[in-house]
């Protein structure tokens, strides 16, 4: 028994991930909030994304190492991407840059920014930047609050990947810490083109 406890302590990261997976499995098994109305997310094709180079060249050894350890890959939407939320079609225009789901670097081993949270992350980053979504034909959905943007993120990801527990963890992380990015975008006051 002490051997098992020693191993759990030694490999604590995997112990934590294993416990979270078990909780997530139980939550999905019993259908936590499966009957809840979601945003009805649909799309015709995956977004066409082009990676943007991480600028490590010319930074010197320590600067490049710092960029590699703390930076994250950014992506540019290569062509207009249409999607439906709450029965309305919206578009994220070509040229929009984002970093995938904004997952802390130390968690990238288990959760890729362009993995199961990609679709929600793309729509969410656009909603955070502009505080609205651009309708496919013309106009916008009107102003969105930070909470409404976070709910859209959560619901899109639940509809796409079915991992209720993971998506609620991500949602609550946004509710707790997302105000930093939200307020930063409000200061810049980006406008739709």
Where are these regions (language model features)?
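Extended terminal accessory/targeting regions
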Residues: 2-193
